[in-house]
């Protein structure tokens, strides 16, 4: 079970997203490259919608927070991180 204090002030970074992409979808992209190409579509990295769903599930499990449906429809890493981090900031 996730300790509630783990969630306070938590943000998902490009580094964490890169690791999740590799672990859940087998897509390897270095964090600096992901950051530099943050406005590029996930498909440009080889990540499909099922891979993104796997990342969402991992984040929900880790943070103990349900992420809104629109997170699953994000097209870019920048959009995804903005949506996820906004949700984590407001989660109690």
Curated annotation (Swiss-Prot):
Pfam families associated with the record: PP-binding
Residue(s) carrying O-(pantetheine 4'-phosphoryl)serine: 49
Coiled coil: none
Ranges of residues in domain Carrier: 11-92
Keyword Phosphoprotein included in the entry's annotation: yes
Post-translational modification: 4'-phosphopantetheine is transferred from CoA to a specific serine of the apo-ACP-like protein.
The organism's place on the tree of life at top rank: Bacteria
Keywords: Phosphopantetheine, Phosphoprotein
InterPro entries, per the entry: ACP-like_sf, PP-bd_ACP, Ppantetheine_attach_site
Entry keyword Repressor: no
Role according to the record: Involved in developmentally regulated synthesis of a compound biosynthetically related to polyketide antibiotics which is essential for spore color in Streptomyces halstedii.
Protein's name in the database: Probable acyl carrier protein
Protein's organism: Streptomyces halstedii
